[in-house]
């Protein structure tokens, strides 16, 4: 069994000194001897050495040292023979590793080419190579291969650490036959150097081509370099050995600080496609504390290249420990709960915060269960209180007016009239300047019955006072008697603070006074019909406000009215009597109503503070009536009266109100149309501050005067006595 190439022995002294088992060295002229080539060791010893790595290292050291070139010509010395004997034993073992005809042929060729190798390629720089290439190329155009070769040379020249590996340096390293053949083929191509020569250096430019697969199995022994984590994807360094497919698959080595990687399990793939349909992965216990934890980092699908790493790991945010995180969460929950409790202390249902239900030992990526969260949510959401629908009784009260009076209240008013007489007596001292006594004609035996109807007030333009709408209805009387001329005044007093449903407005409408000798033209209507009037009342001046508050009911929101009548002395002129003496006023708080009367005695004169202005118009049939008796201070013209008239009432004092108002009265005919309108004005003398007299019109109405409490001027009334029916409505403000 031959273990090496056939060698010819040199005839001489050296050949005689060798034993038959020594390695035969080659002669100087290259001829080989035909002696025996018995191996010095047995087969078992050589097999044992072949399996041990120590023999490999010895063979590498032999091939790396220049043995052949140094001792090829020195065969005469004894030291050379001993050296060759030692080498022969080593090469005999190594020859078992390379025991193929291809390797034997390759070794012979390698010796021939190594002697002929020149260092011209090694010494040339990229600039020299390009200069030589373009000097040979001249003006001929470049093809695609030449362009790529030039670009690769320029890229090498740009990187300072890139250099061409010399063939001499490759001889000093141990190479397998296949690797040596590859390096021989690469060294033969000088015009197109491969970019792989600089693949071990990390300073390549991004323009270099990618020449590796997605997951190369190359191994990089440089563990101490931390630049591998920040390498750009376009670099030519070998792939970093990290576990991309979980801890089950083995890799050449694993880093101690691991990152969670995407897994190819169906659950992980479903997370990447639809993260909301699955649970988030839990944080690993072995994960380092200096790596930031992000829930969205597990839902990213990895790319084909393993070098695409997130650059956020360069400056990781240090997360606190679990004990510190639990303390911070407890403090944060207390701070969030404190303002919500203080703000909602009065409310019975205070929404608890979500932080109070989270465990302080919970991990950052783990939330509460859906079932528990659904139980918390209804308590945190406070339902708005539903608006209570008003009942039918409330809507009826709102739709109807507050100032609605029924005839059933009138007997109660008559029964309790005497109890409120003391209230009118207390006001006598305040109205002494307006006291005045006149004789009233005795009224007819009719009981005054009033009914009030209050439709909704409609005012087009706002005004400082407020006006109210009232209708007074009374049953018709069977018999009517024309009454003589009676000087009576009719006025309304409104309180300073009126109910919200009522409104009063001021209309100053001055009308010329009629002549004293003018007769009264009255239209009468069929029996049972009422008289409709539109009333607007306004308060004017501080005195009016003072008098209005006196007659205002304490707790009732109903409007307060005061009816006054001025009676004259029988068959006597009262031209100089302008002072009115106030008397007791009978009022009823339940109805907000007050009646009064006053007499005007002769010889007394006093300046009234204010008078009421009324303008009345009636539409009735026109029977002729005797002319009214005209007094100097009171003038009545065209006053429409109903078919029911009253006899002159007894003398009884009443209180005079101070207000300025305008009354317009309209009465429709039986056919439903207004046939005729007549204005009736009654003027009263009014003294200003200098003593001058001013006339203001007043309407004249006949009505029944109630008796006083002390029994003076009492008039007996029966339950069958009736009063005329009046209807009042709101009059819109007129602007002159």
From Swiss-Prot:
Disordered: where is this region? 1-46, 178-210, 295-321, 338-519, 565-614, 647-701
- Comp. bias regions, Low complexity: 474-505, 573-587
**Chief localisation class:** nucleus
Keyword Aminoacyl-tRNA synthetase recorded: no
Q: Show the coiled coil region(s).
A: none
Membrane-related topology note? Peripheral membrane protein
Tell me the keywords, alphabetical order.
Membrane, mRNA transport, Nuclear pore complex, Nucleus, Phosphoprotein, Protein transport, Translocation, Transport
The terms under GO molecular function for this entry are:
structural constituent of nuclear pore
Basic and acidic residues bias: where?
19-31, 375-397, 664-692
Claim: Oxidoreductase is one of the keywords in the record: no
Q: Which GO terms describe its biological process?
A: intracellular mRNA localization; mRNA export from nucleus in response to heat stress; NLS-bearing protein import into nucleus; poly(A)+ mRNA export from nucleus; positive regulation of mitotic recombination-dependent replication fork processing; telomere tethering at nuclear periphery
Q: Which InterPro entries match?
A: Nup60
In Swiss-Prot or TrEMBL terms, this protein is called Nucleoporin nup60
- The gene name on file is nup60
